[in-house]
Amino acid sequence: MAMDQVNALCEQLVKAVTVMMDPNSTQRYRLEALKFCEEFKEKCPICVPCGLRLAEKTQVAIVRHFGLQILEHVVKFRWNGMSRLEKVYLKNSVMELIANGTLNILEEENHIKDALSRIVVEMIKREWPQHWPDMLIELDTLSKQGETQTELVMFILLRLAEDVVTFQTLPPQRRRDIQQTLTQNMERIFSFLLNTLQENVNKYQQVKTDTSQESKAQANCRVGVAALNTLAGYIDWVSMSHITAENCKLLEILCLLLNEQELQLGAAECLLIAVSRKGKLEDRKPLMVLFGDVAMHYILSAAQTADGGGLVEKHYVFLKRLCQVLCALGNQLCALLGADSDVETPSNFGKYLESFLAFTTHPSQFLRSSTQMTWGALFRHEILSRDPLLLAIIPKYLRASMTNLVKMGFPSKTDSPSCEYSRFDFDSDEDFNAFFNSSRAQQGEVMRLACRLDPKTSFQMAGEWLKYQLSTFLDAGSVNSCSAVGTGEGSLCSVFSPSFVQWEAMTLFLESVITQMFRTLNREEIPVNDGIELLQMVLNFDTKDPLILSCVLTNVSALFPFVTYRPEFLPQVFSKLFSSVTFETVEESKAPRTRAVRNVRRHACSSIIKMCRDYPQLVLPNFDMLYNHVKQLLSNELLLTQMEKCALMEALVLISNQFKNYERQKVFLEELMAPVASIWLSQDMHRVLSDVDAFIAYVGTDQKSCDPGLEDPCGLNRARMSFCVYSILGVVKRTCWPTDLEEAKAGGFVVGYTSSGNPIFRNPCTEQILKLLDNLLALIRTHNTLYAPEMLAKMAEPFTKALDMLDAEKSAILGLPQPLLELNDSPVFKTVLERMQRFFSTLYENCFHILGKAGPSMQQDFYTVEDLATQLLSSAFVNLNNIPDYRLRPMLRVFVKPLVLFCPPEHYEALVSPILGPLFTYLHMRLSQKWQVINQRSLLCGEDEAADENPESQEMLEEQLVRMLTREVMDLITVCCVSKKGADHSSAPPADGDDEEMMATEVTPSAMAELTDLGKCLMKHEDVCTALLITAFNSLAWKDTLSCQRTTSQLCWPLLKQVLSGTLLADAVTWLFTSVLKGLQMHGQHDGCMASLVHLAFQIYEALRPRYLEIRAVMEQIPEIQKDSLDQFDCKLLNPSLQKVADKRRKDQFKRLIAGCIGKPLGEQFRKEVHIKNLPSLFKKTKPMLETEVLDNDGGGLATIFEP
């Protein structure tokens, strides 16, 4: 090989690399240089000498790195074709580079070290231990040469562990060989790592204060850091005996290093991994040494030092790790301490709790939040929750919670010490807000556990806080959502106001405490007098601030259980709530109501409903008083919104359920619904509901847009229509018969019994609702017709978009963050269009809610309505072609699903089949077309036609809606057709330390899923059966992973099993099997989907191959299929006497057969495949003891190509 050839090539390569890395190079030159370099790596026969020449330390760093890349490429892609001598030469050359071809540890670039270690690891993966038995000895020898070499050895050992154990980037047999050899040599490796760490730490500590030896100290420190990083890669999976060897020497060293500033972070990482270990409890017991005096001292002093000098990022990151260490330590204690365990509560448990509490009270929201799960584990623990030390710290924990519940610390603000830390942890106020909300929900859970352990102290603290807030002057702060609205109390609060954040936190605290107290204490232990005193104070508190009033209402609801002991306070409670139902910030204001005011009024209505639902017996004696009050409010048409009116009616209906007398309740409902019936059944209304043109004129969508501030001429019409629909829904939803059968009989609710002996009930609202049903169906028919293009053309600007989605709905579907500061002073609807959109959206959904509730509410009285199927088909299912996805989806969910699920079996043929047959056929056709459009769109979107970058783009919204509709349809089919007989245990995780190959096909669908009676009924009808099968199997190739996963695992096989006994057309069998393979092509990159689809394909092939040869023809078309392997598989399948292989083995074989059609992730589709050959196996499963013999026998007779 001529050296000048190498020199010439190297010169060209240096130029090419320089061009590629030069920012001033043109795109054309850069591409040419890249092409030259890639072709060189692929084709040049003298890659190794060129790579070695370029990697010499005399070259510049980018050239050296490219030289090392060439060598790595040779090992990865050419190794199998190299001779023994070539391999030995390359190995020796690389080892020489490490020994003498690298710069000083402090000068050498990290990417050079990384590239060198990668080459060695790639060789190890191909040759160790069989052909390179002395690899560890060679690394040991290298490490003795100096700090640079020692650090490189650390890199090699770490990367080897990552590739073999963590990422598992090599074939199973090689992985097993290497991992088992590593395990056998672990004592040696571990002692090497520990000695390296100790030696370098000792040297570093000796010279770190000597300025003349600064570089020496830094070199030792760098090796120490590398040793800690490498240990972190092993601690996670090696046997616990190595971690706890020599009286927990490793843990001791790590604790000592916590106070060594340059090494403390790496030490904390190692400690965290060690303390977080799972596995046998017996093996983990030695970890309790960390509760000892010495370890505790080092951990706590390190925390104090790190937190002492203010906020420094490096120290703060370390503090986070230490916090995690304490969390993991607490979780280990909870796991190890049990009734049948000999582990005792540590003597330093009190000190641990105090130090842990220090993290809970730290200004950093992240640190506070990190401690919550461990507090939860401690408070739940059977033994620790009774420990006096833990009980003593609960008041302190609750005091900390009181502070932590207050929403402060936004990164953009400076009103709290938390803000500074938040600027490190969160990119924006929105990020902080999302984190804080989820963290506060978790804290609420833990707080409730603490309250359960000490309910009286908790209640006392909550009471004090409530009294304090009631007596404190309101501070709206400087950041206001409200422009000066004169209320006599200064400006109103915003969600950021100092008063509001305190009220909000106190309200959450009080709610949690009282709920737990009533659950925990006996009736006679409840502090009734104190509770009533607090309730009176809240009832007497008066405020005109809507946000504060909302908190006050929550406190009234929270304290309401005390009224069960003193019912005489009930009228006062209702008086407070009713005054809030009509709340206004400015009396007799003609201005539009603001969001804050609307929220208060809704809150008051909800509270009334909640009390009537949860305490109907308590409220019943006051029924007449309530009824009169509601009638008075309803008499003024403009005083309440339609939703508020109906909420109050719902509350009355809930109490009327306590009459437990059919006739009395029926008379009451008749009276309550009389105003609704008179509007709804009038001739004018009938004309409006039945005629689309009349409807458009009535609701005002043909009017030119008027000023939002002026009177809306059709507003009252829409209000009346909404009132009727809301009222019908409220009555249908809330009216029910007594749950107790004897009470139901006595009250006249039972009208007979079914053939199986179940009682048939009648609902007091049936008569009222059924007479309103015709007009309701007319409204639904008219509403559906509105979407026809010719009807939309009749609407005036801006109401042409009246049927569109609201912007808030679009944002929710696209997952866009909501604005942080809801503009509480802004009107509920910003524009007349927005008001109209909300009207149509609510009206549409409520109509279908009524139909959905009618079945479960009225039962046989609804299902026996004459020609019900025809009536529904001619109203709810009219003009579906023009109904958008966002309207069709709620219709399926709130109407079709309950209609079908609650239908008695005797009405399946007359009602369900005539509706679902055409519906499923239509839905399949619609979804297929939509997915076809989406697929074509993604194919057309090439480089020239870039996709719209706008996250709110219409295409993204449409695609997401199609996805959501698909899920709704598949869910409807599954609910109708499939019942799950048993829980699916297949997804249980493998046991710790299980070294068996876990095939992804282990995630199998539940074999217990069977067809329901309705499913069987539907499958009897050929048109419905075809629609169901085609929809289910076609959906496997639609671009929605979640839908595919559910359909594959729950629906496909039960449906197919139903038709297997009959005769299937060969074309149908081919299509079904091909559909599953297409699904694999689309979703094979997702492990869960791939496992379910492989299992389904396997089931179909096994069931149908013996009867249909055509299915074999499909298999033969799979790319790269091994025909001989397929023949063997078929032979075993078709010959029952041979078929004794375990199901898992057969499935694995089948998966290998169809591997050619399993889709890959985009990142792997164009990656060049690396082939690592298996070496003769060292380890035979039958005789595990031979492993050591093989190693000790100088390679056991195997050819060793790498001689030392």
Swiss-Prot record:
Marked site (Pre-miRNA binding) residue numbers: 441, 448, 718, 1045
Keyword Cell cycle attached: no
One Gene Ontology cellular component: cytosol
Chain spans, region Pre-miRNA binding: 641-642
Modified residues (Phosphoserine): 826
Pfam family, one: IBN_N
Residue ranges, annotated region (Necessary for interaction with ILF3): 533-640
Tissue: Expressed in heart, brain, placenta, lung, skeletal muscle, kidney and pancreas.
Domain of life: Eukaryota
Consequence of substituting residue 552 to I: Found in a patient with nephrotic syndrome; uncertain significance
Residues covered by region (Necessary for interaction with Ran): 2-108
Subcellular location: Nucleus; Cytoplasm
GO MF term list: mRNA binding; nuclear export signal receptor activity; pre-miRNA binding; RISC complex binding; RNA binding; small GTPase binding; tRNA binding
A single BP term in Gene Ontology: pre-miRNA export from nucleus
Cited SMART domains: IBN_N
InterPro entries: ARM-like, ARM-type_fold, Exportin-1/Importin-b-like, Exportin-5_C, Importin-beta_N, XPO1/5
Record keywords: Acetylation, Cytoplasm, Host-virus interaction, Nucleus, Phosphoprotein, Protein transport, RNA-binding, RNA-mediated gene silencing, Transport, tRNA-binding
N-acetylalanine sites (modified residues): 2
Modified residue annotations for N6-acetyllysine: 396
Signal peptide annotation: none
Similarity-based family: Belongs to the exportin family.
Function: Mediates the nuclear export of proteins bearing a double-stranded RNA binding domain (dsRBD) and double-stranded RNAs (cargos). XPO5 in the nucleus binds cooperatively to the RNA and to the GTPase Ran in its active GTP-bound form. Proteins containing dsRBDs can associate with this trimeric complex through the RNA. Docking of this complex to the nuclear pore complex (NPC) is mediated through binding to nucleoporins. Mediates the nuclear export of micro-RNA precursors, which form short hairpins. Also mediates the nuclear export of synthetic short hairpin RNAs used for RNA interference. In some circumstances can also mediate the nuclear export of deacylated and aminoacylated tRNAs. Specifically recognizes dsRNAs that lack a 5'-overhang in a sequence-independent manner, have only a short 3'-overhang, and that have a double-stranded length of at least 15 base-pairs. Binding is dependent on Ran-GTP.
Assembly notes: Component of a nuclear export receptor complex composed of XPO5, RAN, dsRNA-binding proteins and dsRNA. Found in a nuclear export complex with XPO5, RAN, EEF1A1, and aminoacylated tRNA. Found in a nuclear export complex with XPO5, RAN, ILF3 and dsRNA. Found in a nuclear export complex with XPO5, RAN and pre-miRNA. Found in a nuclear export complex with XPO5, RAN, ILF3 and minihelix VA1 dsRNA. Found in a nuclear export complex with XPO5, RAN, ILF3, ZNF346 and dsRNA. Interacts with EEF1A1, ILF3, NUP153, NUP214 and ZNF346. Interacts with RAN and cargo proteins in a GTP-dependent manner.
PANTHER family referenced in this protein's UniProt entry, alphabetically: EXPORTIN 1/5, EXPORTIN-5
Protein name: Exportin-5
Taxonomic lineage: Eukaryota, Metazoa, Chordata, Craniata, Vertebrata
Gene behind this protein: XPO5
